[in-house]
């Protein structure tokens, strides 16, 4: 084995020289220079000071403006809640441990940090699944006269939390485990060992199949059908120009969210799967650290996309920030008229 396995950790470095120590007890400066840990801490600080205000603002603006409380926006707000879980439950912990060079909070802290990070990522993924299904149903209309309402949104929210916890909670109760990864300052699922005592192999396969492959398959199917439907509608002019434009804008926003999610998480998932399927292979701590910390950036892109591409929300956010006034109102009125994204979910067949 090219790493060192302990009772509750796996350090990607051979202990032939005897320098490897538990990441719960000693600084891991033999894995990288201290400045590398400082960079990680600074990066996490950046994610905290950007991720918290932008996600909190998304929630606050929606609560402040009643017209934003639409079924589709429930799902988008769910993404903001998931991101806040990651910020408070994961990023603050990782920043502090990176400053010390090892996971100072012990096994319990590792479990909590791993749980919140996994929960946030899975809520985001399953929220995108619900959004993809909503887009497919609204645009492709497999069910005539269907309108995505509040009850459907609540069912979608329930699905995201049930499925996310079905992935994040088992390691807390003995099916797999959370251990420090990369530079040993953040925690995640144990992809590094088979660990038969906790049936680790079966959990990793379950997670990749049920909580990664299946969601991506559903998303791919929905958007494959959606692209065809949009082209057909444009060719046949079955909908009014305003309706088609609104549907295209919401669809474009959700597609960009999906692409951004894949850009952030595919590298991490690919590296994790490689490590799992190549047990004992040689890899350095940076090999897992970079994609792991890059995936954490997903906490800031969803609200950014939402703010940039949803004119109605953007206007409400500006009026909130400027105490009820919109200094850019003249520019907004002079721009091309766009139908608000949040209203599209209630578009009925023509």
Curated annotation (Swiss-Prot):
Superkingdom field: Eukaryota
Region (Disordered): 330-350
One Gene Ontology cellular component annotation held by this UniProt entry: membrane
Glycoprotein as UniProt keyword: yes
Disulfide bonds, paired cysteine numbers: 110-187
Residues modified by glycosylation: 2, 15, 200
Cytoplasmic side: 62-73, 134-152, 231-252, 310-350
Post-translational modification: Phosphorylated on some or all of the serine and threonine residues present in the C-terminal region.
Transmembrane segments: 37-61, 74-98, 114-133, 153-176, 203-230, 253-276, 285-309
Gene3D superfamilies given in the database record: Rhodopsin 7-helix transmembrane proteins
Tissue: Rod shaped photoreceptor cells which mediates vision in dim light.
GO biological processes: phototransduction; visual perception
Entry-linked InterPro entries: GPCR_opsins, GPCR_Rhodpsn, GPCR_Rhodpsn_7TM, Opsin, Retinal_BS, Rhodopsin, Rhodopsin_N
Chain ranges on the Extracellular side, renumbered to this chain: 1-36, 99-113, 177-202, 277-284
Extent of the signal sequence: none
Predominant location category: membrane
Record's bilayer topology term: Multi-pass membrane protein
Subcellular location: Membrane
PANTHER family from the UniProt entry: OPSIN
Biological role stated in the UniProt entry: Visual pigments are the light-absorbing molecules that mediate vision. They consist of an apoprotein, opsin, covalently linked to cis-retinal.
Family indicated by similarity: Belongs to the G-protein coupled receptor 1 family. Opsin subfamily.
Protein name: Blue-sensitive opsin
């Amino acid at each position: 084995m090219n790493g060192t396995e302990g009772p509750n950790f796996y350090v990607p470095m051979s202990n032939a020289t005897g320098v490897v120590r538990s990441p719960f007890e000693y600084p891991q400066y033999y894995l990288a220079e201290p400045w590398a840990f400082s960079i990680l801490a600074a990066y996490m600080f950046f994610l905290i000071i950007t991720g918290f205000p932008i996600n909190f603002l998304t929630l606050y603006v929606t609560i402040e403006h009643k017209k934003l409380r639409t079924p589709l926006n429930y799902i988008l707000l769910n993404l903001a809640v998931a991101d806040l879980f990651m910020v408070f439950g994961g990023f603050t912990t990782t920043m502090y441990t990176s400053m010390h060079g090892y996971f100072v909070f012990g096994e319990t802290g590792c479990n909590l940090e791993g749980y919140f990070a996994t929960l946030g990522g899975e809520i985001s993924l399953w929220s995108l699944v619900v959004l993809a299904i909503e887009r497919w149903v609204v645009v492709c209309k497999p069910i005539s006269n269907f309108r995505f309402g509040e009850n459907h949104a609540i069912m979608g929210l329930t699905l995201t939390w049930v499925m996310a916890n079905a992935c994040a909670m088992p390691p807390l109760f003995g099916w797999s485990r959370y251990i420090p990864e990369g530079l040993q300052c953040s925690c995640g699922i144990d992809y590094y060992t088979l660990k038969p005592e906790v049936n680790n192999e079966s959990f990793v396969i379950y997670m990749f199949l049920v909580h990664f492959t299946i969601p991506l398959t559903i998303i791919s199917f929905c958007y494959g059908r959606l692209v065809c439907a949009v082209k057909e509608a444009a060719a046949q002019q079955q909908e009014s120009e305003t309706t088609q434009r609104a549907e295209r804008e919401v669809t474009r926003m959700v597609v960009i969210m999906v692409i951004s999610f894949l850009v952030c998480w595919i590298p991490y998932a690919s590296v994790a799967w490689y490590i799992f399927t190549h047990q004992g292979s040689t890899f350095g701590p940076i090999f897992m650290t970079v994609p792991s910390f890059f995936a954490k950036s997903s906490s800031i892109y969803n609200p950014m996309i939402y703010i940039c591409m949803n004119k109605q929300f953007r206007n409400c956010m500006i009026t909130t920030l400027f105490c009820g006034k919109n200094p850019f109102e003249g520019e907004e009125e002079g721009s091309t008229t766009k139908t608000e994204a949040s209203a599209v979910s209630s578009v009925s067949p023509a």
